[in-house]
Amino acid sequence: MDAAKYILIICYLLQTLLPLQISLATDSQNEAEDSEEDVSSIIAKLNKGQTCFWPKSSSGIVTVPYTLSVDYTSTDSAIIYSAIQEYTSLTCIRFVERKTETDYIQIQSVDGCWSYLGRIGGSQVLSLLNPGCVLKGIVQHELNHVLGFVHEHTRSDRDTYVYMEWANIPDVYKSNFEMTQPATNNMGLPYDYSSVMHYGRYAFSNAPGKATIVPKPDPSVPIGQRYGLSALDLQKINRLYQCDVCSSLLFDPSGYLNSGYAQSANQNRSQCVWLIRIPTNKVFLQFQSFDPSPGCISDSVKVYDGAGKMSPLLINTTCGMKKLPPVMSSGNLMFVEFLSGGASTFTASYQTVACGGMQTKLNGTVTSPGYPTKYLPSTDCIWSIVAPSGNRVQLNFISFALESSRNCVYDYLSISDSSRSGTSVSDKYCGAKNMPPLVSSGNWVLLKFHSDIVRRWMETNDLGTDYTLFFTTERI
């Protein structure tokens, strides 16, 4: 079934279904619970004579104008903007502040979390009740309804993947679980238990602990997350609106980026992007290679501290740099943009880091975790110190007292730069000593601190268990 037929299906839904409303999220947004309401009066306001998809410009951009109620706090607004930013970064959808457009959405705190399906013509309300609905995944759920998407658990092949416990669903809410008619066009994509459009296991249950939706064949599969759009959610948006983009969402706690893979799947792409969105803590990104194409003049890798290009820039690396500095985000989001006019490639890996950070100032201080108190066992911290291009980093230690062991196999501080891998014994330091000044060969230094699970050094040492260093930068 082609996209045109899918438009007819969605428009049919607009004429026959009540507005869908997302339930609130609990348990750290892992499950969606029952707070939706059916608002039958809204269906009478639908303009049935208009197409329900938002139009696409000749440049390939789909614009959805919106207004945002002044009733939201600055914190609420920041959450909504962050949710919107992911569409901008990874699709051809652009939610933009309304100027004089006739068709637009009004984001307001009305009476729950709900939205019309698709574009209905004129102004249309998207309700995000505050408090309760202003969470990133809930905002994106409702924005997906605006784009024309129904709930994942109502798609026409759902009986293969989930079982509805009808006895646990009150009659007034059973319409929210009925399979979509006519049959949905799933665009050749698999059923998505992790979709932001999927209800939670206990949504609308008539009794605590009684499930209304059970995955099969494995009933333990998580459903109903409200962290944000899934990778398949984004694929559906890009296929439905025929977005000509090269983008990927990475959401595992660790993983890899490979521009060669992206380019092989998207020939002749001049731009590919990755959004790394880990569940918690910070993203640490380390490049294994950067191979500019012969004669390149503008190929680059840009890394942003957030969900897109409106976020602070962490690095902007072009052809002339062979060794890219390791970078760390301030939160759980990092955006990577690769621009190439030829055959340039890069490979990188990322991981979740709970302790550490990135320093880009001309000077500063780095200390052991918990300083001036003793650091805890089973602790890992990473610090990336990056100086401006053409500069180098000097480390001057004020104090250094870690557990001593042969080859520093217990507690240690490893120090590496662009000339060293950071894995050899000579890069690890431990014990109590006067550390000499260390100078990098390039413009960055990577510090990795590790303490093992045993507290033997901390219990017997009278010298203290910490390190403190002052770093400066200077022209090479």
Task: Pin down the residues of each PLM region.
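Domain-level representation of secreted and single-pass membrane ectodomains enriched
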Residues: 3-6, 25, 231, 240-476
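Short, polar loop/linker segments at the starts of domains and inter-domain junctions
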Residues: 52, 76-82, 174-180, 207-221, ...
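Short glycine-centered, acidic/aromatic-flanked micro-motifs in structured strand/loop junctions
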Residues: 66-70, 128-130, 287, 399, ...
